[in-house]
Amino acid sequence: MAISDQVPTGSDFHAKSTAAEVLSGFDLTGKTAIVTGGYSGLGLETVRALASKGAAVIVPVRTPAKAEAALADVKGNITMAAMDLADIASVRTFADDFNATHTQLDFLINNAGIMACQQARVGEGWESQFGVNHMGHFALAQSLMPLLERSQDTRVVALSSTGHKISDIRWDDLHYDAADYDKWQAYGQAKTANALFANALSRRLRATGGHAFSVHPGGIFTPLQRHLPKEEMIALGWLGDDGEPSELAKAGFKSPEQGASTTLWAATSGALNGKAGVYCEDCDIAIPTDLDSPTARFMGVNAHACDDESAERLWELSEKLLSSA
């Protein structure tokens, strides 16, 4: 796929649609889903919605006590299993256990992530946002690949964001070994990587009718902002001087229930059949960014996040990085 494939489907859903509305009429009994980050924010709402429709949902957890408390009131067939995206060995152990106990995987929702955190290293010295948001999920998909390839019509959804507009992949200095660390640029690189991952994976699932998509869920107040001081969120316009959501945020931000809707639309919509690898927002395929529009910063997808050659280059690079982990 390429930027020219970013053509909306004319979806009946929109920016304010909720997870429940998107899944209305679906019966997911007999389906199996993995949702990373499934015990807070968007992930929790994604788990809630899938389970309410009968899907068996497996939630990888880094902090079991927190996960148990968050999922306690969620009804349905939900299982927790230990995994830390910053620890590739734990990712492989989770996947090995899943492969040994399951014969299909219908939905892989790569929801977990970190944003604009202070400089840190994970894995084999990887910059943490690239390491957690991309490499951890890449390792998970690689370890689950035999099952993904055997499962008919599987869907993989990678949560990117409008943050991809901040930065392309920093091919010559992925981990800020040479340049000064920029937490927002690093976040942008990771979100571009999420989109390119879905692009490349979609080609690898084609033989069995599988699809992979990336999505921008929208602006939502979730634990993702935990690394940002209040002063920075005020400067960004997300909060007013009183520390409460600004008028801009009230008008443009979504609730977690609304934020989960695009993920679930990408996971289930028949309108996306044959359109693997596209980037979605507001429950439809996103249009290319209109650089002359006042909404260019917030809407649409940039060409660097839809480039096939970059997607394959990142896949090969990620395989090399993973081989040493």
Please state what every model-predicted region is.
Residues 59, 83, 251, 303-306:
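Pocket-edge positions in alpha/beta enzyme catalytic cores
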Residues 9-11, 91, 190, 239-297, ...:
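C-terminal helical subdomain
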Residues 179, 183, 245-248, 299-304:
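A short, mixed-charge helix-start or loop-turn motif at secondary-structure junctions
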Residues 56, 74, 294, 304-305:
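Short alpha-helix boundary/capping motifs
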